[in-house]
């Protein structure tokens, strides 16, 4: 009887302590949301005059980087949703003011929310990513990685203009 009770208690404790692992998509979504919170905060906070700033003539301006992020997000998330992707540089060519760029960035975030809300099963489906069959999850990982790459540019541009980037500020 004692053995049965101990086995039962051990089983209950194991089941009670077990937690299901978060899905791959939800983990990538968390990473993407954190990154885009910083990118969007920077886009909103940087003054209009700095949107034209380029540290050297051959690189994108701050505004062009933000527009590029908005456009590329739209492209990657379209791939992940199975929609026809737009050209990566559509927004970069059409949005030229801070207001238009911030609006495009927020719209691309909203669009991407749908892609990151898909299940792991849905994100296992294969789609065309630059001419190669990859999973929808791969397209979402590419998006999050690409956003992080350009947030590095944003941090540098802000520092060169004596601004503190969102990710370097004390947390509340």
Where are the regions that the model predicts?
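Sec-dependent N-terminal signal peptides
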Residues: 5-14
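Acidic/histidine-rich alpha-helical segments that form the ligand environment
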Residues: 42, 93-128, 134-146, 150
